[in-house]
Amino acid sequence: MEAEELIGSSVTIDSIMSKMRDIKNKINEDCTDELSLSKICADHTETVNQIMRVGNTPENWLNFLLKLEKNSSPLNDDLLNKLIGRYSQAIEVLPPDKYGQNESFARIQVRLAELKAIQEPDDARDYFQMARENCKKFAFVHVSFAQFELSQGNLKKSEQLLHKAVETGAVPLQMLETAMRNLHLQKKQLLPEEDKKSVSASTVLSAQEPFSSSLGNVQNRSISCESRGQAGAARVLYGENLPPQDAEVRHQNPFKQTHAAKRSCPFGRVPVNLLNSPDFYVKTDSSAVTQLTTRLALSSVPLPYVTCLLHLQLLALAGLAKGSGPDRDAILPGSRPRGSDSYELRGLKPIQTIYLKDSLVSNEKSSELMSDLIALKSKTDSSLTKLEETKPEIAERRPMQWQSTRKPECVFQNPAAFAPLRHVPDVTPKADKESPPISVPKWLDPKSACETPSSSSLDDYMKCFKTPVVKNDFPPACPSSTPYSQLARLQQQQQQGLSTPLQSLQISGSSSINECISVNGRIYSILKQIGSGGSSKVFQVLNEKKQINAIKYVNLEDADSQTIESYRNEIAFLNKLQQHSDKIIRLYDYEITEQYIYMVMECGNIDLNSWLKKKKSINPWERKSYWKNMLEAVHIIHQHGIVHSDLKPANFVIVDGMLKLIDFGIANQMQPDTTSIVKDSQVGTVNYMAPEAIRDMSSSRENSKIRTKVSPRSDVWSLGCILYYMTYGRTPFQHIINQVSKLHAIINPAHEIEFPEISEKDLRDVLKCCLVRNPKERISIPELLTHPYVQIQPHPGSQMARGATDEMKYVLGQLVGLNSPNSILKTAKTLYERYNCGEGQDSSSSKTFDKKRERK
């Protein structure tokens, strides 16, 4: 008897060792694949081409970009530009209307905005806004945007973004609540480390994507068949139908990396843990598995075999499953499953009733369970290729009593965490303020969608897995007063219900002639969109006289009182100043309501910022001409008591070869008896901001706000930075990447500003006079207008030019008094012969001719 037991034990040990060797060989093969992948990834161009060939998915792009960023540490200017270029390339090839519901695509957009914030914070706001519009259902997109605004000192804007995220139903809600709480506590980080850990699990599970990407991870994502199978099983487990593309399993993926280290690293502002991270499984306690098992027990729907396998693996990880026995058979009936089999889980018992006397599983049973799992996995992988999309119909359930005395708890605290990512709501624009309708899957009760879960009954418990209604945050469509009012198309969309938020927001470069804007009864046809920023958009339009104008549209529904006041100031300043100078952009018409503002303005060819980016080298005469235009425009606003305080290249536009000033959004009007004004907050662009606008000059606080002084000399500093950019190709402090270090360098007198030698000595002198930190010692606009650099320098040939001009006047004077063609021809021949012989002008004859003209 003992001999038989020894023989049986030896056979079991041999079997275990054999399986361990197989696993070891499998790991070695995967490591070899990873090394090959690393060699391939050394050539980024080849990697990008490979991504395009295998499907061009956001998951592959994010996997590549994270690895590229990890290898780019520490970050410098060249690497930063390279990263921004790669992220921009990814966004260009990934259409937002197709991947707007994809988490990996959202993280790519957010990370690009964060990198732009490092390089140029002014441009970063547009990228954050783009990410918010394209991927509004993800909470981390809104939190990242709010964190950026908070870092720029825009507390109200940050709070407004978080409130709007809650209204639109962004998930997970817990992340937004945490960010809102920290914002009210005046913390610098909206998601501290301890809060990031608490929301990481819910963030990953709410996505329910096979390639759950993390903003806080810089490791490669596993996109193997195993991960796709488990993620698909999780979605079936919670009542979601598998799309056909997820039911199919790729036989080979060149980006497979199944054994890479999974750890949470600070990447961006909202790091979370992956679903396949070891830390996640460590945190999976028995209570979560208990509730999951209880839910399976109450289900009357036949679930595929892969769902049962996933549940069995969860039990094994929690240490709750036995190697064999009736309880295990209740969980996974049958010993030889097939890929097409499904099982009734009606008789599954809650986990509390399973025999759990021992907290730890014995070594023999653990090895047996592991061998069964390996066998089941191999069969499941083969069966997944035949798996088809199932459409389970949930029968009406009557309330059931829990078999345990313990009150049921929701596995996840956020009721919106299980919103299926692949469900896109159908939003139809309406003129009223009602929320748009949403198409709900058959297994959902539309009336109970988005309700708060309760533990009173099973129905209340299941409500935590309902799909939340996404609220429309776009302006109501009005056929007579919206830039997106395509009258015929809009009526058709309202009838068919095919409009989406993205479709109602985006305007193509070559738009239809049906797109029009009505301003004070005048109709303007939209040609294209030429700019956007924040809540405003600029369109190139054609007026009724077939003249090209620009219309600036501002959405006021989400704007606070300070923003609305800034736009009203802009209109008032334009009306006031355009009468005194042609260097100010012209305002032809405007319309103001509580919902929007329309401004019909002069249309420029290109703004100065875009022009500088396109020009490799600037002609000295162009630079001098544009510099004089800027001085004249700023001099006019200073004469009318206005300090712009946010001058930058984007505030100037080129119109028919002349530079004109635009955008007075944050300008302030000074009183006649003052030389400076006190602002309630720091505004302006860091690269062009004067030191006195950064430093607390007043040493006083009002309503807990730091007040700073700005004066006309502050605009001189900004103009000097623009001229520095036009001369050297960068701003004086652009090479300093860290924003805090940049601010210190601007206000620190010990930090010397570099002025490399150039051929134009007067230009270098102007730069030195403008970039003086002490505003009292800084040059003024009138002094700059009289500076030798602005004046046209006389050339040696100027006297010769004046002589040629006099000769031309003489010739024209001889011809202008003649009437008959014969006289004109005779005089012309005489003049030609005289100049051809070198005789030149006869002054006496010229004077005589002038006297004859006077007598006539």
UniProtKB/Swiss-Prot annotation:
Alphabetized Pfam families for the sequence: Pkinase
A Gene Ontology biological process term: protein localization to meiotic spindle midzone
Residues that bear N-acetylmethionine: M1
Regulation acting on activity, per entry: Inhibited by the ATP-competitive kinase inhibitor, SP600125.
InterPro entries listed in its UniProt record: Kinase-like_dom_sf, Mps1_cat, Prot_kinase_dom, Ser/Thr_kinase_AS, TPR-like_helical_dom_sf
Any one GO molecular function term: protein serine/threonine kinase activity
SMART domains listed in its UniProt record: S_TKc
This protein's record includes keyword Repressor: no
Keyword Kinase appears in the UniProt entry: yes
PTM field: Autophosphorylated.
Summary of subunit composition and partner proteins: Interacts with TPR; the interactions occurs in a microtubule-independent manner. Interacts with MAD1L1 and MAD2L1.
Family membership noted in the UniProt record: Belongs to the protein kinase superfamily. Ser/Thr protein kinase family.
Function summary: Involved in mitotic spindle assembly checkpoint signaling, a process that delays anaphase until chromosomes are bioriented on the spindle, and in the repair of incorrect mitotic kinetochore-spindle microtubule attachments. Phosphorylates MAD1L1 to promote the mitotic spindle assembly checkpoint. Phosphorylates CDCA8/Borealin leading to enhanced AURKB activity at the kinetochore. Phosphorylates SKA3 at 'Ser-34' leading to dissociation of the SKA complex from microtubules and destabilization of microtubule-kinetochore attachments. Phosphorylates KNL1, KNTC1 and autophosphorylates.
Protein name per UniProt: Dual specificity protein kinase TTK
Organism lineage string: Eukaryota, Metazoa, Chordata, Craniata, Vertebrata
